[in-house]
Amino acid sequence: RFFLFTEHGNYVDGQTTLFELTYNPKGGPLEGRSDLVGIVYMYNLYHWEMGDVQLKQEGDLWKGTFEMPENCAFIAFKFQSTFTLQPDSTDNNNDNGFMFIPQNSAGDYLPGRYLAWGVFRMPSLGSETGNYFSGNYKEISNEAAMMWTDQETKHYPQYGRHFFGTMNQF
């Protein structure tokens, strides 16, 4: 199986850009399905956002486009059989996630990337990431989550007021 997303447009500061994604369900839980939807989880300037990606089948592959804000520091995708809160089948890469740390138009990583990487993988924090992982997911430890928070503090101290509430949960 593979998953790929590529830029399909250009950033305009503070705006969005269009990305194209390609998903191959072969060998996964969604192989052979006739209708799929993609769910995108974005951490945009210290706020979680979710959206859907309408997918169209092209041979064995599924393709779609989505808009990503310029300030998006973390992005994850999950694919499912229907657009419901309780789909009968999902693919999140066996709880390993389809997760990425994007760069802005200048090639720089953005504030929030470390915090999002840690918080997303610790759903017990109630990080507004929905039901990305299965009930069998083993989340990262408090120590690992704190390490990611420490990295955020080290690299982006000027944004501390945005993530102070998250730090109090450890």
Q: What does each model-identified segment do?
A:
Residues R1-F170:
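Glycan-association/targeting regions that enable binding to alpha-glucans and other polysaccharides
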